Regions:
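Conserved GTPase G-domain substructure that encodes guanine base recognition and part of the catalytic core
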Residues: 1-86, 91-271
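Membrane-active amphipathic alpha-helices enriched in small hydrophobic residues
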Residues: 263-315
Length: 315
């Protein structure tokens, strides 16, 4: 499946929008190389933690293609493809010890799988933690025994605490403002610290847990930024075609950082890096930066149509 945005940019390059000769060919070659890339993300967590709702919040599942389950080694894992994105929704853990053992073997098999180049297939793992549950045993066992042993770079592990709105049984969640009040925010900050320290103590891995609410679309941009930064820089642009087109999803985040602007910067930098690394046309990166209006100040007609949904991130 091809990237629609990259197809549009390649078409503009063929028209000479980014120069002619070697610069033009460099952009086209770089785009063609990027179009052959796949970005694989696995979602892991306990039953009821909200893997499906999280995936639906971040990604445009209306156009997702459902993969088959013919591989007996990963029969319980659901695969979705959205252009160059491949999402792996693993079965929930913690309900049945016998099934947990089966699922753990399947998840481990997925995390150990190699692509045609011999590299690990999965680019990152998003481990979801239930913010409403004080019993974190399943979450910690999943991280320690199922995920951590098979991820070479711990920076590729995202710890995301979902259901932050009900972490105190719904108390101190402001429904009108769709955000936690001070008491709940303080409790969630403590949970983040506790989870980080527990993971470090049991695995030796340094993580940066964050909390969000898939139901209320709170801190979805924060989660997306963490996911983008965790993958190789040249692949970060591949998120763009797959994202949820509903601008309301991206509006409400905490104010610790300007997540939406940073997302745009990462997308711009990723495409520039991919093109610069492809051939001698190093100036293509800056040209593409101007070409994409939502990650730069200048609007272009085709780019605006292709990437307009990201404009909601600026809101």
């Amino acid at each position: 499946m091809s990237s629609r945005i990259l197809d549009d940019i390649a078409e503009e390059a063929r028209k000479g929008s980014f120069g002619t000769g070697e610069d033009q060919e460099s952009v086209i070659r770089g785009i063609e190389l990027l179009k052959r890339q796949k970005l694989n993300v696995a979602f892991v967590g306990a039953t009821g933690v909200g893997k499906s709702s999280t995936i639906n919040s971040i990604f445009n599942m209306d156009v997702a293609k459902v993969g088959d389950r013919t591989d007996p080694e990963t029969a319980s894992i659901q695969k979705y493809e959205i252009d160059n994105m491949v999402l792996w929704d693993t079965p929930g853990l913690g309900d049945n010890p016998e099934k947990d053992r089966q699922y753990a073997v399947e998840i481990a098999g997925l995390l150990k799988r190699k692509d045609e180049k011999g590299d690990l297939l999965i680019d990152e793992v998003v481990v979801l933690v239930d913010g409403s549950n004080r019993d974190m045993k399943t979450a910690y066992e999943t991280i320690e025994h199922v995920v951590a042993p098979y991820i070479e770079d711990p920076k590729r592990i995202i710890i995301a605490i979902n259901q932050c709105d009900v972490a105190l049984k719904g108390r101190f969640w402001n429904n009108d403002r769709c955000e936690p009040e001070a008491q709940l925010a303080a409790f969630l900050d403590q949970k983040v610290t506790s989870v980080r320290e527990r993971i470090a103590g049991s695995t030796g891995i340094a993580t940066s847990p964050m909390y969000y609410s898939a139901l209320h679309h709170y801190n979805i941009s924060k989660l997306l930024l963490a996911m983008i930064i965790a993958v190789p820089e040249k692949k970060r642009f591949l998120f763009t075609d797959s994202l949820n087109r509903n601008p309301d999803v991206w509006k409400k985040n905490d104010e610790l950082e300007t997540y939406n602007q940073k997302i745009q910067q990462e997308v711009k930098g990723s495409l520039s890096k991919a093109l610069e690394g492809a051939a001698a046309g190093a100036a293509a990166g800056a040209s593409i930066g101007r070409f994409i209006p939502v990650i730069g100040p200048v609007a272009g007609a085709i780019a605006g149509a292709a990437l307009g949904f990201l404009g909601g991130l600026l809101g």
